[in-house]
Amino acid sequence: MPIKHAIVHLIEKKPDGTPAMLHARDAELGDSQAIENLLADLNESYNAKNKAWGFFQGESGAYPFSGWLGDYLEGDRDFVGFSREAVEHLQKLMEESNLSTGGHILFAHYQQGMTDYLAIALLHHSEGVAVNESLEVTPSRHLDLAQLHLAARINISEWRNNKQSKQYISFIKGKGGKKVSDYFRDFIGCQEGVDSPSETRTLLKAFSDFVESEDMAEEQAREKTETLVDYATSQARIGEPMTLDALSELMDDQQPRAFYDYIRNKDYGLSPEIPADKRTLNQFRRFTGRAEGLSISFEAHLLGSRIEYDEERDTLRISSLPTQLRDQLKRRKAEQESTS
């Protein structure tokens, strides 16, 4: 993961309305194993977070970041100058947000594979302990990436090469209420373009419809479910979206376009690339059971809605039966009535 440029600035601010103080670095960080380790750990922590996805607002006085980034990429300003202008803008937005707290702000332009990224993160320290060379226990401060709450990553290559894309920016969703992280999103100038949970739910609905339409055996349906969930989870782990054509090929290498064509023909309105939402995925794994001529299999997210479990009576109540099953039951009932 080659790091092209990296720098850290410091903004001191408490969430009490006091002015923010900026301590800006005037030179890039040199190449070192430490900065490589930091960026690797940052990416690992960032990829594990729930994120929103979007694109740049139109450049304006309120959203100047994309213009500064474009100038840097065109060579009209250097990386230090770009980061300095950006962090001064962030300082102003922090002062307008009483709930915000300061920290070290990392800017890193790096390459992963053939793709260029810009990572921006607000880093905080935690107090710990260490054992020194004299074997004494001493206080120790370290960057606490487990407490990463404000960070964004811009896919520079996607932004520059795909003008229609609406998901080349990702940023961590704030847990402490929307207003806590709004200023950071406004700093980037990001407009949400893809609702990751909604897109993931729509994809899973399309998959369930596809499985039903193909009248798949239980084992085959289970295998395809695992393929979908494993692929989506692996993409979420590395911070990359799912692509419908790749997913379709993984699900059936004999008919690699089958699922993709089904989605397109049914017009689910899905984007070609979908950022996976891990919470939605975790609700999708299947419950299965087989005994004495009875076989039951259903997706976990249906429990509590279409399927209700009564532990005391040891029963399942199913509503909105699959069309094929309903038709079979109706035919059987009609046959019984005609012979009675």
Swiss-Prot record:
One of its GO terms (cellular component) is bacterial nucleoid. It is found in: Cytoplasm, Nucleoid. Coiled coil: none annotated. Keywords: Cytoplasm. GO terms for molecular function: double-stranded DNA binding; single-stranded RNA binding. Signal peptide: none annotated. It holds the Pfam family NA37. InterPro entries: Nucleoid_associated_NdpA. The keyword Translocase does not apply. Its main location: cytoplasm. Belongs to the YejK family. This is Nucleoid-associated protein PSPA7_4451.
